[in-house]
Amino acid sequence: MDVILLERVAKLGHMGDIVRVKNGYARNFLLPGGKALRATEANKKHFESQRAHLETRNQELRDQAAAIGEKLDGQTFVIIRQAGETGQLYGSVSPRDIAEAAIAAGFDVHRNQIALTTPIKTIGLHEVPVVLHPEVSVNVTVNIARSPVEAERQAKGEEINVVEETNLDELGLEIGAALADAGGSLGDR
């Protein structure tokens, strides 16, 4: 299906481009989201008549996103979660959690703007991209910790005591070697 893009779409094109996309992508994402119009003759004429208005609206949105991006770029958000001794979270931190932390800090960020490919499942400092506009993207740091004290220590760069996972195979070999050195085995008793 040929569509006319009403805004810049990543890996597809800029506003005003006529591109060919799969029918499902157009019907389920581009058309309902107001990102494109079907490329019919009537829509082409309508788009050309509205082009100046759409460009000014897009420029205003980009300027607003750039202003928010200047304040948001480099910010650190602390999220407190329960985690095991190895640093693995008992759940995960999703884009919604990061957006809620940003909103609590006074930033207007929607969860769809958080470009997290997979949920975060470990404690520590994590860089997360935030796409405020197709042309404006910034990075924020998410500090995931078990307590506020631990979050402060992580922010200062101190090492957090995380118990390393024990490899049971290596442990068995070490016990076997110790028994061999002692001249006995487990079956001697």
Curated annotation (Swiss-Prot):
Q: Name one Pfam family in it.
A: Ribosomal_L9_N
**What are its GO biological-process terms?**
translation
List the molecular function annotations (GO) for this entry. Answer: rRNA binding; structural constituent of ribosome
Q: Name one GO cellular component term.
A: ribosome
PANTHER family assigned: 50S RIBOSOMAL PROTEIN L9
Provide the function of this protein: Binds to the 23S rRNA.
What family does the database annotate? Answer: Belongs to the bacterial ribosomal protein bL9 family.
The protein's name: Large ribosomal subunit protein bL9
This chain's source organism reads Beijerinckia indica subsp. indica (strain ATCC 9039 / DSM 1715 / NCIMB 8712)
